[in-house]
């Protein structure tokens, strides 16, 4: 019996490490449903909501503070059992702008003024995005035993997410399965001018799967940092952020680059008790480092109250973070920025 279990374990390990044999197998989801629920390996089910921008940069300082506070409350909605991802996609637009200018003609003497104003607005739109179409998405997921269990839970989370966006004054729309497939298709076919052609009724008629409609000709991941999708090359970068605070302009300045790219923030909320315990442990470690530095100072014959600036900064930041977690109901997040 023990031998059989060992053999089964080896087979499972081999299955996990087995390389994909096709472009379709490389795409890491199990099933996409018409209502937008996507099943991932490991029993994780996700949904995606597309949302639009908010006029944060041009708002007054008071309004910016209110927007920032509302966004912080929005992020605090997600607990440790609800991982989520923010995706920002910049792609070159080959079709008409998503923003349309429609000033109808009237039976008066001002049609020439209307035409001039319409032309000016269209030029402003064209110059503002440099042909780059910028889209924003939030994807959230829950573990579940099956689609029947996952669907109502995801619908409740989706309603809460959209309600939070509404309170922020941000237009948003849930994405169904076709919309999510179209987004994946655009990501895997950069520069493609052909529209995404797909219908759910084609699945039983053709015997194809959803991945067959979105997969490129090939994937090539043989290089350490570069990759190839079809005929296009891409690269993946990550940010190692050492600053204790970040400017609220960081993400905006990255997304304003005149380039096709995808920026993702993979966010996992840390359990509140675990976060507090972690910070207390860090504070204890910093305290030990202070004692060690003071001992060194005494042995060297100089003032033990003079500590390295970095140590003072770390101590202050850790104390402030602990106060935020304990008294202000803030949350700690694990963030991967790619």
Explain the meaning of each model-derived region.
Residues 1-338:
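Extended, folded cores of ATP/NTP-driven motor/assembly subunits in large transport
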